[in-house]
C-alpha cells in the first residue's frame, strides 16, 4: 500500500504510478494538468500561413484532400491572434521582415514557427541579394526547419509531425 505523496523525485513517480494502477481498475485516470494541456495543445495546432514565394504553393497543397493536414489536428487560421503556429514559406525580404515580426508578436503564447524552404531557412537562391534576409531565424525564433527548394508537401507534413512530437516530448518549448 502507498504511504503518501509527500516524497520527492523518483519515489514520487513510483508512488504516482502505484496510485494510477490502483485507480485504473476503478475507471479513473491520474494525470497532471500540464499533461492534459500539452495533450490538447499537441492535437490542436492552429496555423497561419506566411507565404512569400513559390513554397506557399506547396504549403497550400498540404491542406488539399490528398494530404489533408486537418486529420492531424491542425487547422488554418486567418488571424495571428487565433493561431499558435506560423509557417514561413518563401523569400523573406528586408521590407517584409518588420511585418513578419509584428505578426509573430501578435500570436499568443506558446507560439511555434516552421521555416519552410531554402529561402526561408537561409536566403536560398537569393542569398547574396542586398534585399534578402538570410534566414527568417534572424527575425523570429524558429522551431522546425523544412529543407527543399521548394520542399514537397510530404516534407512539410513531416515537419509538422516533428513539431507535434517535440511538443509531446518536452511540453511547452523553452526558448
Swiss-Prot record:
Location (main, coarse): membrane
Stored Pfam families: Oxidored_q6
Sections of the chain in a coiled coil: none
Residues the record lists as binding [4Fe-4S] cluster: 54-55, 119, 149
Cofactor: [4Fe-4S] cluster
This enzyme's EC code(s): 7.1.1.-
Keywords from the named record: 4Fe-4S, Cell inner membrane, Cell membrane, Iron, Iron-sulfur, Membrane, Metal-binding, NAD, Quinone, Translocase, Transport, Ubiquinone
Record's GO cellular component terms: plasma membrane; respiratory chain complex I
Reactions mediated catalytically: a quinone + NADH + 5 H(+)(in) = a quinol + NAD(+) + 4 H(+)(out)
Record GO terms (molecular function): 4 iron, 4 sulfur cluster binding; iron ion binding; NADH dehydrogenase (ubiquinone) activity; NADH:ubiquinone reductase (non-electrogenic) activity; quinone binding
Domain of life: Bacteria
PROSITE patterns for this protein: COMPLEX1_20K
Subcellular location field: Cell inner membrane
Keyword Cytoplasm appears in the UniProt entry: no
Membrane topology note: Peripheral membrane protein
GO biological process: aerobic respiration; electron transport coupled proton transport
Free-text comment on the cofactor: Binds 1 [4Fe-4S] cluster.
HAMAP family xrefs: NDH1_NuoB (MF_01356)
Role description: NDH-1 shuttles electrons from NADH, via FMN and iron-sulfur (Fe-S) centers, to quinones in the respiratory chain. The immediate electron acceptor for the enzyme in this species is believed to be ubiquinone. Couples the redox reaction to proton translocation (for every two electrons transferred, four hydrogen ions are translocated across the cytoplasmic membrane), and thus conserves the redox energy in a proton gradient.
Family statement drawn from the similarity comment of this UniProt entry: Belongs to the complex I 20 kDa subunit family.
Subunit-structure text: NDH-1 is composed of at least 14 different subunits, Nqo1 to Nqo14. The complex has a L-shaped structure, with the hydrophobic arm (subunits Nqo7, Nqo8, Nqo10 to Nqo14) embedded in the inner membrane and the hydrophilic peripheral arm (subunits Nqo1 to Nqo6, Nqo9) protruding into the bacterial cytoplasm. The hydrophilic domain contains all the redox centers. NADH-quinone oxidoreductase forms a supercomplex with ubiquinol-cytochrome c reductase complex (complex III or cytochrome b-c1 complex) and cytochrome c oxidase (complex IV), which stabilizes the NADH-quinone oxidoreductase complex.
Protein's recorded name: NADH-quinone oxidoreductase subunit B
Protein species of origin: Paracoccus denitrificans (strain Pd 1222)
Species lineage: Bacteria, Pseudomonadati, Pseudomonadota, Alphaproteobacteria, Rhodobacterales
